[in-house]
Amino acid sequence: YGTDHYGMSYPVHLTAWGYGQMSALLSYLMVPFIKVFGLNPVSARLPQLIVSLLGLAALYLFSRDAFGRKAALVIFAFGAIAPWHIMQSRWALDCNLYPHFFLFGIFFLNRSLKAGRRKLLLCLSMVMFGLCMYCYGVSIYTMPLFLIMACVYLLIKKQVKLWEAFMAFAVWLAVAWPFILVM
């Protein structure tokens, strides 16, 4: 228990198709559903559906913060009926988690800039961005680049202090470090 077929304990990347690597987060999210419902299409697809629905909620909340309630309702409606969103919420494909966890990170980062619980929300955003690393292999390039650009922008605009940027980086690194070690 807790090992792949090569004997690696709780691997960060799973071997797929005999040679390639597959992001592990979706597989780990499936475990409790497979335990409860058995191995079937519903238990394999349910985690993706739940994350997709939470992604729609995060899209609405972020849009409401950024553009107001009316615009957020329109954005939410288009997101809910978008063919891409409908299809990706049905497929148990590991990379389909990435846009949702990225959106969760953006949502919490945006809230951290406005809210009273600034440090908690900033750390939560970095946890979400760190989990992005386990959703899609290309995140090894996109996440550090995005975080560096966001950090520079927020420091220039004086929306975060230098010590907050270091704290955020430490949280992101703590979550992403196992992934970075095996890449």
Segments predicted by a language model, with ranges:
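Transmembrane-helix motifs of polytopic, lipid-linked glycan transferases
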Residues: 46-67, 104, 108
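Transmembrane-helix signature of polytopic, membrane-embedded enzymes
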Residues: 59-81
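Transmembrane-lumen/periplasm boundary regions of multi-pass, lipid-linked membrane glycan transferases
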Residues: 1, 36, 131-134, 140-183
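Extracytosolic helix-loop segments that constitute the early lumenal/periplasmic catalytic or substrate-binding loops
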Residues: 1-18, 24-28, 32
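Hydrophobic core segments of transmembrane alpha-helices in multi-pass, intramembrane catalytic enzymes
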Residues: 52-55, 79, 94-106, 142-149
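Membrane-interface transmembrane helices that cradle and orient dolichyl/undecaprenyl
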Residues: 67, 103-124, 129-132
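Short acidic/glycine- and proline-prone juxtamembrane loop motifs at membrane-interface regions
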Residues: 84-97, 137-138
